[in-house]
Amino acid sequence: MVTIERVQTGLRIERNTLKVLKGLAEYLDLSLGDLVEGIVLHAFEGKAPFGAPTLEKIGQLREVYGLELTAADAHKLEERP
């Protein structure tokens, strides 16, 4: 186990993306922060953060919460005024 120091941060994220992340965190019994840290650490190493069963659950959550954005949309989103 590695001992770390966490800081509180505020970030803005698309509404349905957040709903899916929160639903997934609950499903995996993780805090939202732990889930995001895990995703980022995997991405930094070029590794996939999820296996097939979790990806299936993500697909279900995307459908439930109407998340239509994909990786192709990243860094191209325009916020409503």
Per-region residue spans from a language model:
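Short Lys/Arg-rich basic patches
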Residues: M1-R15, K22-A25, R62-A72, K76-P81
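Residue-level signal for well-ordered alpha-helical scaffold segments within enzymatic catalytic domains
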Residues: V20-G23, G38
